[in-house]
Amino acid sequence: MKPNLYICHTAYQVLVDLLRASRTDGQPHIMVLSAAVPEPQSLAKKLEATGAVKVVIVDETRWPGTVTGPFAARRARRAFEKLCGWRFTRAAYNEVRIHNDWSVLGRYLQDCHAGYILCEDTFASTLGPDQHLVTDQRAAPDFAGKQRTGKGYLYWGDSPWCAKVE
C-alpha cells in the first residue's frame, strides 16, 4: 500500500496528522513540515522516531511569488521545486492531505493537479459568521472560469484539484 502525504504548517496540524498516520496502514507515511513550524529539525527527529512518518522539511519562504503567462502552472511547479528543494509525485501517494490550501505548498499542489484533501481546521474557521473570504472568492467574476479550467488559484476547497473537504 502507498503511504499518505500529510502537509503541515502548525504544531496542531502535526499532532492531528501524526494521529492519522499512526492509525493508517501504509506506514511510514510522509509528512511535509513547512519551515513555519517551530523548530522543524528537532520536531522531525521526534516524529521519525515514532515510526509512523518520514519527514521532509520545505522552506516555503524561498518561493518569491507566482508565475504568470503561458504554461504558468508548469513553470511555477518547476521553479518551486528548484527553489524549495522538494518535488511532489502524485502517483507515489495514496491520499494527499493539507490543512492550508491557500499556502505556497497549497498553490504548488494545485499546480501539480494533486487531487488533495483539505483538512477540517482551515475550512471550518474560514466559514465563521464574520468571514468573507469564501463568499468573496465565489463572487469574483473569474470564479466559474477558474473552477472549470483549473487555471489560476482557488482556495478553501473550491479548486478543481481539491478532491474532498473534510
Predicted segment positions?
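Catalytic cores of histone-lysine modification enzymes
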Residues: K2
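Active-site and donor-binding regions of nucleotide-sugar-utilizing enzymes
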Residues: L5-K151, W156
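Extended interaction regions within the primary functional domain
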Residues: S159
